A protein has these predicted regions:
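Conserved P-loop NTPase catalytic core
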Residues: 7-40, 44, 118-190
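Generic recognition of flexible, low-complexity loop/linker segments
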Residues: 14-17, 74-81, 86, 118-121
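Flexible beta-alpha connector loops of hexameric P-loop NTPases
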Residues: 30-31, 60-65, 99-111
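Hydrophobic/aromatic interaction determinants used to assemble and anchor large protein complexes
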Residues: 51-58, 81-83, 89, 123, ...
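Short glycine-rich substrate-engagement loop in P-loop NTPases that contacts/grips substrate
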Residues: 54-77
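Conserved P-loop NTPase "ATPase switch" module shared by AAA+ and STAND
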Residues: 79-109
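Substrate-gripping "pore-loop 1 plus following alpha2 helix"
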Residues: 104-118, 145-146
Length: 190
């Protein structure tokens, strides 16, 4: 939201952030070691989050859906009835660990990747955005060669933003470990 802008020191980043500040409701979730399909994990998280912000929507059961795009369109219609001027951003962490575990489940990962592909399609036409954190270039990983075709179709629908080690070092040094003058004085005195 706009109140977070004061914490941004880099002028270009701050200007870019102003354009979207407060324009999205944000669901952040971490996928743990789960047996559920990616579809069911994300749908359950979405339904719970939407309910917590006053949006009433239930996805149809997985066995009744032939394409999730219509379900997302209906979800966003319900969302916009309550928040007409905002979008919905879903941020998922640890997606790579989840997908790695799913590679051993045969066709399960293909269904998960198909669901991701549908999410990518939805993002193009709705005020819905999806962001996932992975620790390696999953689209080029040898671990997923057996589902390379499915991965390619997912890749075509998402923009990748690689983060280099130098980027991580910068964030740690400038954001996490940076000290104020008062903090530095206390450290020196100690």
């Amino acid at each position: 939201d706009a109140s977070c802008l004061d914490g941004i020191r880099h002028p270009a980043v701050k200007d870019a952030a102003k354009q979207i500040a407060g324009r999205f409701k944000v669901l952040r979730t971490v996928i743990g070691a789960a047996e559920k399909s990616l579809r069911n994990l994300l749908v359950d998280e979405l339904v719970e989050y939407l309910s917590s912000i006053g949006v009433n929507y239930d996805f149809p059961p997985a066995d009744k859906v032939t394409n999730h795009i219509r379900a997302f369109e209906d979800m966003m219609a319900a969302f916009h009835a309550v928040y007409p001027d905002q979008g919905l951003l879903v941020v998922v962490d640890e997606l790579l660990d989840y997908l790695r575990a799913r590679t051993e489940k045969g066709e399960a990962i293909v269904l998960d990747l198909s669901f991701l592909r549908e999410i990518g399609e939805v993002c193009k036409g709705l005020n819905f955005r999806f962001m996932a954190g992975v620790q390696e270039a999953v689209f080029d990983s040898h671990r997923f060669q057996h589902v390379a075709d499915s991965l390619r179709r997912v890749k075509d629908r998402f923009e990748q933003i690689p983060i280099a080690r130098n980027d991580v070092k910068f964030v740690v040094a400038e954001r996490l470990l940076r000290k104020t003058a008062d903090q530095l004085a206390k450290i020196r005195d100690h």
